Amino acid sequence: VKTVYIESELAADLDRVWHFMQLPATFLYLCRGLFGVPALRRRSEPLQAGERGTGWLMAFHALPAYRHTIEVLSVDDATHTIRTHEYGGRIRSWNHTLRAEAVGPGRCRYSDTIEIDAGWFTDLVALGAAGIFRYRHRRWHKLIRIQATRQTPNTRAAFPPR
């Protein structure tokens, strides 16, 4: 088992980041360009503990990579933490903890911790995960910058096409 950890300080208040963390549209936006999950495309409801789903993970939005399963273990409003258990393809276990915490007025720290078990492929999968999550954190900063110029109650309109 390998653990990948990455954190970023975002120029947004905790409530805003926590709201976005719970939306499947945020996940799709953060991963856009690397992969997509067609099963989530029309989903607008926030994540809820106990949910479980399986769908194709599409590399570069075109190539079916493998069927990925996610189970949402917890969505904790008090600690601003989401925990999932995921697996699929070569990945036996991908335990993901997403967390946000206030660090000052209009600023918060967002972190991802991923515990990965992919058997003999664990080191390679962990290396890939580190790259994916660095990309996702860059996209978080971009999303926050875009959101700073918009005030929209429409969740779909909150996510730009690129």
Where are these regions (language model features)?
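Short strand-connecting beta-turns/loops that link adjacent beta-strands
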Residues: 13, 77-78, 103-107
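Hydrophobic residues positioned within well-ordered beta-strands of beta-sheet architectures
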Residues: 4-6, 55-56, 68, 82, ...
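A conserved amphipathic terminal alpha-helix motif
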Residues: 114-162
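Beta-strand/loop substructures that line and gate deep hydrophobic ligand-binding cavities in soluble
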Residues: 83-131
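Hydrophobic pocket/interface hotspot
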Residues: 16-21, 27, 72, 82-84, ...
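Hydrophobic ligand-binding cavity/cleft-lining segments
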Residues: 1-49
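Hydrophobic/aromatic beta-strand elements that line small-molecule binding cavities or substrate pockets
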Residues: 6-8, 67-74, 86-87, 95-102
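Glycine-rich portal/gate segments that line the openings of hydrophobic small-molecule binding cavities
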Residues: 28-29, 38-87, 159
